[in-house]
């Protein structure tokens, strides 16, 4: 017989976003026993458990931590607040009425009727199948995150001679990690004319170890039938098409793919929340509320982040908003994404989070996060209220691999006669 539970707040995912959201909700008046975290893995912490390198926590804790240390701090806070959680619990669906259906070995099939839901499912890696690389399907082709888990958690070495396709942060970090474990990383090839990772990771993970980064290059063939024996990489033109005659062959037994992250939003679609075509995450308002009232989103399920500190900050915002919603404190509009002020991304800005602002519901200062679509040097981030420019901040360098942000003040959005706020990149 199906088990039924009732909770004020259900959080899908027990990673850094889910934990921070749960803690914030409990610290903002929601009784801990009315919160439930559902995590499909066997432990809390999410992706951080396999990120054993340092560099986490500089913004949140003002000190440098490893991934597991950072996760442990939030896990300890959640446990100190006695927030309930279920491990090994796979969520199957979320209805627009906020009924969560899940299954676990311990509880079997069960449903949770929730007052509010926070989506914190994180993201997944883009696979080889999305790349259409010619060749057989030999052993030795891994996503960078899978290789990271094998090396850091399972104690297995994927290979000894490595080529990496893609220069996302996970790929850069795994170039260093594989080198430290004794492998030879021959090259990191990147399709775009710029790296997809943070500048500090390029320096610390590639430059410091003498690993070459070839921009505007991609893998055009994987050699080997049973096991990878080598790969061919080629330069690409400005339309990202391989250029004949530029082929280079590298003998290797392992190819790691770091070719992008995709927010994990199958449950979001099932709940009826619209997704952004740019981020592949849900469209949200100033409270990080999706198009379905009472369902909120935060972390990498919303848009892919560089820093976990920003994930925690965003998740805390969602936790506070969900607690306020459950307790009846939010001033409801007809629909979460209707009315209000529309945020527009123009002139090199690919998207903004949030997309809609209702000034009556926003905090005193709202952080708007975004990414640019190319490399910009000595340019300006500008914010327009209608046709009036109200912010104009110079940035030495902006790149797609590094998230940017602007701050909007609630006081500036009261009694206004415009219905759009535009975030753009300008030359001067």
Task: Identify the residue ranges that each predicted region occupies.
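FAD-binding core/adjacent interface of flavoenzyme oxidoreductases
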Residues: 1-12, 31, 72-161, 238-245, ...
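Beta1-alpha1 glycine-rich phosphate/pyrophosphate-binding loop at the start
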Residues: 9-73, 77, 149, 158-202, ...
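Predominantly flavin-linked oxidoreductase catalytic cores and closely associated redox partners
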Residues: 109-110, 116-213, 218-227, 294-297, ...
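FAD-site-proximal beta/loop scaffold in flavoenzymes
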Residues: 119, 141-151, 254-305
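A conserved FAD-binding loop/helix module that cradles the flavin
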Residues: 298-345
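Surface beta-strand/loop "capping" patches
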Residues: 331-376
